[in-house]
From Swiss-Prot:
Keyword Transmembrane helix: no
Organism from which the protein derives: Mycoplasmopsis agalactiae (strain NCTC 10123 / CIP 59.7 / PG2) (Mycoplasma agalactiae)
Any one GO BP annotation for this protein: translation
GO CC terms, sorted: cytosolic large ribosomal subunit
Name of the protein in its database record: Large ribosomal subunit protein bL12
Xref: NCBIfam families: L12 (TIGR00855)
Keyword tags: Ribonucleoprotein, Ribosomal protein
Keyword Ribonucleoprotein: yes
Function: Forms part of the ribosomal stalk which helps the ribosome interact with GTP-bound translation factors. Is thus essential for accurate translation.
Length: 123
């Protein structure tokens, strides 16, 4: 028996009616033991994984916009740091303030830093 090429298979499919294609699909499901619900679950898994990744964010301080003192105070208060540590962190921009925190917490942290005058990015 000659090997069926991809091109000849596609060409044959083009000549079939919709009903014939549906019958072919059903026959393939039976022949290879394909469970359509398992395929749907497997296809949905990457989407759920991507959604999970979006639920945790990192807060990155991009710039102080000339309002370093206010931002140092905000960082000190929000992260419970000593004044010197907060100053070092703000002096070395861009700086990751917190990683892999819940999205709601990241948004709240960003709002307080923006209020102090900072440019903040959530990743």
């Amino acid at each position: 028996m000659a090997k069926l090429t991809k091109e000849s298979f596609i060409s044959s499919l083009k000549e079939m009616s919709i009903k014939e294609v549906m019958e072919l699909v059903e026959a393939m499901k039976e022949e290879f033991g394909i469970d359509p619900s398992a395929v749907a679950v497997a296809a949905a898994a990457p989407a759920a994984e991507a959604e999970e990744k979006k639920s945790t964010l990192s807060v990155i301080l991009k710039s102080d916009n000339g309002k370093k003192l206010a931002i140092v105070k905000a960082v000190k208060e929000l992260l419970n740091l000593a004044l010197m540590d907060a100053n070092k962190l703000v002096s070395t921009l861009p700086a990751t303030l917190k990683e892999n925190i819940p999205a709601a917490e990241a948004e709240a942290l960003k709002a307080k830093l923006v209020e102090a005058g900072a440019d903040v990015e959530l990743k």
